[in-house]
């Protein structure tokens, strides 16, 4: 059975997300998109932009599959000096700020229905401890309760920080009995840390969707699948062997949009590789 072909609008993150970009995504083979909620791209606080996109989705075949929650609260991806949003922030005020911003973005599901919300649980440098584990339980329980009436499933993503390593994500979800929370497997981070096979084996049935892109195991390059050294046949086989094979979301770097003539072919080829 063919997988849904989902393209992340992260590819266009340096541009305002408008209906023309969504139309292009459909022409290039995407059946659905993941909306990347960076405010310079998709301003979830703008009634006008949300209404414009909602109207387009209602009248077109391309659907909104998921949303990537905000990583920064500013409109410059942190370049203004704004720190990353962090649900495990040492200060209570920082945790509240992160939760409020993520909830603001999630509320757009009332107008643009989507299935999953991908969330960064921690920031680089965060350490695994009883304190961060408790903050994680509290944050995800709250997010799950907020998401349920919206029809959204929050997904935590494996990152490069200790609390977001695969084994710790599983511990958080299972000890906390957080059955309403899933995992988005970030293949690039897995390849840079524990290895893709190990990440899939550890996260197993918690994986609901995958962020698919490539690298060489050192930098988070967001290359087209096949342009790095991830073993794609083995990866696809391992994911397909799960009881519920996850959705594959193509998430290439915005730098690759600087070669627009290549985009249609590269996107179609990537979807074919991902199955």
Question: What spans do the regions from the language model cover?
Answer:
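N-terminal pre-domain/capping segments
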Residues: 1-104, 110, 148, 178, ...
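Active-site-proximal loop/turn and secondary-structure-junction residues that shape catalytic pockets
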Residues: 11-13, 37-39, 70-73, 121-125, ...
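Active-site acidic/histidine proton-transfer and metal-coordination neighborhood
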Residues: 19, 74-182, 192
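Residue-level detector of anion-binding/catalytic polar loops
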Residues: 31-32, 63, 115, 153, ...
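Conserved beta-strand positions in the central sheet of alpha/beta enzyme cores
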Residues: 34, 66, 118, 155, ...
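Flexible, glycine- and charge-enriched loops at secondary-structure boundaries
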Residues: 43-46, 50, 88-95, 126-133, ...
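Catalytic-core regions built around general acid/base machinery
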Residues: 49-60, 139-146, 199, 234-238
């Amino acid at each position: 059975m063919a997988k849904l072909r989902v393209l992340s609008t992260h590819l266009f993150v340096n541009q305002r997300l408008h209906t023309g970009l969504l139309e292009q995504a459909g022409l290039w083979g995407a059946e659905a998109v993941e909306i990347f909620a960076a405010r310079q791209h998709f301003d979830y606080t703008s009634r006008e932009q949300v209404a414009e996109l909602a109207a387009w989705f209602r009248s077109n075949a391309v659907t909104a599959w998921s949303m990537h929650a905000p990583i920064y609260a500013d409109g410059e991806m942190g370049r203004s000096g704004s720190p990353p949003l962090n649900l495990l922030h040492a200060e209570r005020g920082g945790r509240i700020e992160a939760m409020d911003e993520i909830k603001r973005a999630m509320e757009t599901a009332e107008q643009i229905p989507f299935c999953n919300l991908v969330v960064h649980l921690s920031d680089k440098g965060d350490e695994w401890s009883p304190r961060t584990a408790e903050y994680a339980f509290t944050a995800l329980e709250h997010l799950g309760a907020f998401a349920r009436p919206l029809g959204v499933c929050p997904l935590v993503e494996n990152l490069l920080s200790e609390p977001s390593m695969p084994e710790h994500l599983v511990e958080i979800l299972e000890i906390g009995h957080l059955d309403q929370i899933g995992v988005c497997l970030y293949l690039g981070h897995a390849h840079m840390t524990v290895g893709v096979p190990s990440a899939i084996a550890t996260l197993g049935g918690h994986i609901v969707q995958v962020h698919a892109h490539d690298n060489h195991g050192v930098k988070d390059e967001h290359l087209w699948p096949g342009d790095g050294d991830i073993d794609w046949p083995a990866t696809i086989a391992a994911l397909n062997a799960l009881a519920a094979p996850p959705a594959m979301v193509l998430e290439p770097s915005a730098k690759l949009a600087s070669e627009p003539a290549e985009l249609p072919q590269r996107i179609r080829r990537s979807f074919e590789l991902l199955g």
